[in-house]
């Protein structure tokens, strides 16, 4: 399968902000991470086979740092947007 380019906009919330901030900084450039009242906002571009696989990999990495981490994400590629809450696909739409 060909690697696709995805644009990610994600809201990450957790009880342990320090652990998640460190995990996010290991995964992404600091300039793509913004601190919010609820946690963090992440805006990056990633390459992978599918939004589902990228989302699963990201949430698994974050939960290794802090188990009680929540991820609300939107993955955009090729005119399609897929929304996830944690590991669950909540919707998909064509642009």
What are the language-model segments listed below?
Residues 1-95:
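Long, contiguous binding/interaction regions
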């Amino acid at each position: 399968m060909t690697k696709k380019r995805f644009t990610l906009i994600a809201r990450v919330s957790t009880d342990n902000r320090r652990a998640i901030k460190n995990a996010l900084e290991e995964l992404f450039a600091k300039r793509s991470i913004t601190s919010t009242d609820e946690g963090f906002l992440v805006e990056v571009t990633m390459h992978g086979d599918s939004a589902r696989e990228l989302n699963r990999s990201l949430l698994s990495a974050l939960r290794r740092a802090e188990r009680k981490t929540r991820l609300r994400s939107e993955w955009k590629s090729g005119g399609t947007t897929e929304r996830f809450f944690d590991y669950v696909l909540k919707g998909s739409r064509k642009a």
